[in-house]
């Protein structure tokens, strides 16, 4: 059993999270900006099936993270990046990105991105905490991701590939701008083969939470991402110049 939280109640100590299922910490509360910011600041995130479950809060251990400067770009992906004619934008289509990530996929029975989740994260986007990366090719969305930046941490929430390798390209684009955005570490939450192939690693909860304490101020300010459009060669050059 996990504790039931009323809105505004503090989260339990993450060391009390279950090991089966791994990381389940609490249920209840709400998806208000204050609740979400308090949760992410301590390494807790919501993940649940809105059709059959209350809001569930998680803190898995170990934690899947990506040190963006060590992101692995395979030879095939590098060739794809050289050949493709991509345009990259940040925060130009946040709701579209979320809805794209919420679309049904062949290997999944459904989506955890409900309308309530969409509304909550769009509100965080309006407040300057949630952000998106969009990859465009021939005017269509080819890949995307979104997440939350608090201080020097980026908490990745979801990514999608409407076109081949699109989410990988979005992750490389985020890597290319990480220095300018002052992002030190990407929280990928839960291990999966796609992320591990790009250099993700599993970090003990104690080490992960030490990074949170170091890189997230007690009152994290909104972050402002670039509003320009970037052709892929320009973004690659910008990464090398930072």
Curated annotation (Swiss-Prot):
Main location: cytoplasm
Gene3D superfamilies assigned: Leucyl/phenylalanyl-tRNA-protein transferase, C-terminal domain, Leucyl/phenylalanyl-tRNA-protein transferase, N-terminal domain
Intracellular or extracellular location(s): Cytoplasm
GO molecular function terms attached to this record: leucyl-tRNA--protein transferase activity
Pfam families: Leu_Phe_trans (PF03588)
Assigned GO CC terms: cytoplasm
This enzyme's EC code(s): 2.3.2.6
Reaction equation(s) it catalyzes: N-terminal L-lysyl-[protein] + L-leucyl-tRNA(Leu) = N-terminal L-leucyl-L-lysyl-[protein] + tRNA(Leu) + H(+); N-terminal L-arginyl-[protein] + L-leucyl-tRNA(Leu) = N-terminal L-leucyl-L-arginyl-[protein] + tRNA(Leu) + H(+); L-phenylalanyl-tRNA(Phe) + an N-terminal L-alpha-aminoacyl-[protein] = an N-terminal L-phenylalanyl-L-alpha-aminoacyl-[protein] + tRNA(Phe)
GO biological process, one term: protein catabolic process
Role of this protein: Functions in the N-end rule pathway of protein degradation where it conjugates Leu, Phe and, less efficiently, Met from aminoacyl-tRNAs to the N-termini of proteins containing an N-terminal arginine or lysine.
Family per similarity comment: Belongs to the L/F-transferase family.
Protein name, UniProt field: Leucyl/phenylalanyl-tRNA--protein transferase
Organism: Alcanivorax borkumensis (strain ATCC 700651 / DSM 11573 / NCIMB 13689 / SK2)
């Amino acid at each position: 059993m996990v504790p039931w939280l009323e809105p505004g109640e503090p989260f339990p100590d993450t060391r009390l999270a279950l090991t089966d299922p791994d990381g389940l910490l609490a249920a209840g509360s709400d998806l208000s900006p204050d609740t979400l910011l308090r949760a992410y600041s301590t390494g807790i995130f919501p993940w649940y099936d809105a059709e059959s479950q209350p809001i569930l809060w998680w803190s898995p251990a170990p934690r899947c993270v990506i040190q963006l400067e060590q992101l692995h770009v395979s030879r095939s992906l590098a060739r794809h990046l050289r050949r493709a004619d991509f345009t990259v934008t940040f925060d130009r289509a946040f709701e579209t990105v979320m809805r794209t990530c919420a679309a049904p996929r062949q290997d999944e029975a459904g989506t955890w991105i409900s309308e309530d989740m969409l509304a909550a994260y769009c509100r965080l986007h309006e407040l300057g905490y949630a952000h998106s990366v969009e990859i465009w090719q021939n005017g269509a969305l080819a890949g995307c991701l979104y997440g939350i930046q608090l201080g020097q941490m980026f908490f990745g929430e979801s990514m999608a590939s409407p076109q081949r390798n699109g989410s990988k390209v979005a992750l490389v684009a985020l890597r290319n701008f990480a220095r300018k955005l002052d992002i030190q570490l990407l929280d990928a939450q839960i291990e999966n083969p796609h992320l591990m192939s790009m250099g993700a690693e599993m970090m003990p909860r104690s080490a992960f939470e030490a990074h949170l304490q170091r890189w997230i101020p007690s009152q994290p300010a909104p972050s402002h991402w670039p509003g320009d459009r970037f052709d892929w060669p320009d973004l690659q050059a910008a990464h090398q110049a930072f």
